[in-house]
Amino acid sequence: MPAFLLKLSGEALGGEAGVGIEPEILKHYCDEIEAAHREGIKLAVVLGGGNLFRGAHLAAAGMDRVIGDRMGMLATVMNGLALNDFLRRRGIVSQLFSAVPMPGMVEGYNRDTAKAAMQNGEVVILTG
């Protein structure tokens, strides 16, 4: 079966306002992911974080760009935690990874571990 990388915009998770996480939108994405997963399609999902944090207004106020980027990375992790929880509640085995390890919360991304998870039929969620 083929493997696909799915990019979900953080703003899309926020619904019409593009802010926060709208449960119905998250459920819809889970429906689509579940349908593909049930067909045997291997999925890695990359999440944005624009629904929870946009750094442009802080950068305009003088915030260091790197700090803003780090805050955006944390926003993607929060979206990943939500998606991971919604998928698991449906019985879909998924594994959440972050470019920045957060021991006790999110495993640090490792290519081999993520690839093995996909080969084992898990949905891989990539954040950070």
Please identify what each model-predicted range represents.
Residues A12-G14, G50-G55, P103-G104:
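Short, active-site-adjacent cap segments at secondary-structure transitions
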Residues M1-K42:
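N-terminal glycine-/serine-/threonine-rich phosphate-binding loop
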